[in-house]
């Protein structure tokens, strides 16, 4: 049996396919049907069954129907026609792959994307051409899985999508049924970049573990010593990744350096000591007096353009030693206490923010004078370009471990 499946294999209709079709706008579906029929990429398969009991031969003309769909016809009626009359034997495997990629690219279906960076100790390693990458990946998958691949280019962003469906090569059952979500992998290769976008890998899943091994071997074949390391960024918005980690990434808040130069930000969040800068009194006065002009300037400098940084979840772990050894008297007292353990005096505080657009929400809160844009730490303004952060004594630390499973609720 061939390990790579053809795109012309038919998948039986079920509720998942109908649910996927319902995500699309009416006109978008009609346009797709016309394209499938005219280009004969996924032609109607109703000819394989007897249609005499359902439609007359004159009535069954899919191309003429989809070119002139009555305006009064509802989307559900069009979907019914697709499933019952034109593709009654099931959609093709490539047809479903195209639908899923289009739904993700146009935002009809949302999915949490994350990213990993190709790390090499000696030099930067850029991912190869997507077609070359796919062929190398196929060679790694052949001995382990029965698989299907689909590659497509995003219409506006510099991203090439690769969709993979994996089955166990020893037990390739249910090839004609809609695959489980655990069997489907989405990859996104950005142009001239060393960052790989992908869906979130699940912990303790054999299929996901084997797929990660295939990716690791592929990178080693490209350049010995290369490995994937996770980037702590999770978002449903692909533009966010192009802005933060792509080759066209933007310096989102360059004006913030005017504030950093005053030493007003990135201090410990629990530090109660006064700011000792001599020339920052005017900025603090403007902040406390709610000076709208200076506040708005600070907000724009700190947040930049948040429209290209859409985050729906922000997870921050704060690690801080609240015992300050500022005086000799304090040091003597602490040395005399035998039970004192510095590691026990570091509380971990996990802060999680959720919403449709977190950064825009924080920006509005600053405008309402509920937060101070002058002293707000950088991990709350999007300047770090991350959505999962570990902050130790006010400093954002990045993970250095190799790629592993990342299951995020």
Curated annotation (Swiss-Prot):
Gene3D superfamilies, alphabetized: 3.10.20.720
Organism superkingdom: Eukaryota
InterPro entries: Chl4/mis15/CENP-N (IPR007902)
The keyword Cell cycle is assigned to this record: yes
Primary residence: nucleus
Subcellular location: Nucleus; Chromosome
Biological-process GO terms, alphabetical: cell division; CENP-A containing chromatin assembly; chromosome segregation
Any Pfam family hit: CENP-N
Keywords: Cell cycle, Cell division, Chromosome, Mitosis, Nucleus
GO terms for cellular component: condensed chromosome, centromeric region; kinetochore; Mis6-Sim4 complex; nucleus
Summary of subunit composition and partner proteins: Component of the inner kinetochore constitutive centromere-associated network (CCAN) (also known as central kinetochore Sim4 complex in fission yeast), which is composed of at least cnl2, cnp3, cnp20, fta1, fta2, fta3, fta4, fta6, fta7, mal2, mhf1, mhf2, mis6, mis15, mis17, sim4 and wip1. Interacts with mis6 and mis17.
Family affiliation: Belongs to the CENP-N/CHL4 family.
Function: Component of the kinetochore, a multiprotein complex that assembles on centromeric DNA and attaches chromosomes to spindle microtubules, mediating chromosome segregation and sister chromatid segregation during meiosis and mitosis. Component of the inner kinetochore constitutive centromere-associated network (CCAN), which serves as a structural platform for outer kinetochore assembly. Has a role in the formation and/or maintenance of specialized chromatin at the centromere.
Protein name: Inner kinetochore subunit mis15
Organism annotation: Schizosaccharomyces pombe (strain 972 / ATCC 24843) (Fission yeast)
């Amino acid at each position: 049996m061939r390990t790579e499946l053809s795109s012309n294999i038919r998948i039986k209709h079920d509720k998942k396919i109908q649910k996927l079709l319902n995500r699309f706008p009416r006109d978008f579906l009609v346009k797709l049907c016309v394209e499938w029929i005219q280009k004969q990429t996924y032609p109607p398969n109703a000819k394989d069954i007897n249609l005499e009991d359902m439609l007359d031969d004159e009535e069954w003309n899919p191309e003429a129907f989809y070119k002139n769909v009555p305006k009064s016809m509802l989307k559900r009626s069009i979907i019914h026609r697709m499933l019952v009359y034109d593709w009654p034997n099931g959609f093709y495997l490539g047809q479903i792959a195209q639908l899923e990629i289009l739904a993700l690219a146009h935002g009809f279906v949302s999915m949490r994307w994350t990213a990993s960076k190709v790390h090499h100790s000696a030099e930067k390693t850029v991912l190869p051409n997507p077609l070359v990458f796919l062929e190398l990946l196929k060679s790694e998958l052949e001995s382990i899985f029965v698989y299907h691949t689909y590659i497509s280019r995003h219409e506006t962003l510099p991203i090439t999508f690769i969709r993979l469906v994996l089955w166990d090569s020893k037990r390739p059952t249910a090839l004609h049924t809609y695959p489980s979500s655990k069997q489907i992998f989405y990859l996104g290769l950005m142009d001239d970049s060393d960052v790989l976008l992908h869906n979130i890998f699940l912990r303790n899943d054999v299929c996901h573990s084997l797929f990660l091994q295939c990716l690791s071997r592929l990178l080693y074949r490209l350049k010995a010593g290369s490995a994937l390391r996770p980037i702590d960024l999770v978002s449903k918005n692909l533009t966010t990744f192009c802005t933060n980690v792509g080759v066209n990434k933007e310096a989102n808040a360059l004006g913030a350096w005017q504030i950093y130069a005053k030493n007003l930000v990135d201090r410990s969040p629990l530090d109660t000591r006064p700011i000792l800068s001599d020339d920052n009194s005017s900025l603090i006065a403007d902040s406390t007096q709610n000076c709208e002009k200076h506040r708005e300037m600070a907000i724009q400098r700190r947040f930049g353009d948040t429209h290209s940084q859409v985050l729906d979840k922000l997870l921050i772990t704060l690690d801080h030693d609240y015992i300050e050894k500022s005086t000799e008297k304090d040091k003597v007292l602490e040395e005399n206490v035998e039970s004192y353990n510095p590691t026990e005096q570091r509380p971990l505080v996990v802060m999680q923010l959720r919403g449709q657009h977190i950064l825009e929400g924080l920006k509005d809160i600053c405008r309402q004078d509920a937060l101070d844009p002058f002293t707000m730490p950088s991990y709350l303004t999007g300047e770090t370009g991350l959505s999962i952060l570990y902050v130790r004594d006010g400093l954002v630390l990045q993970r250095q471990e190799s790629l592993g499973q990342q299951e995020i609720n």
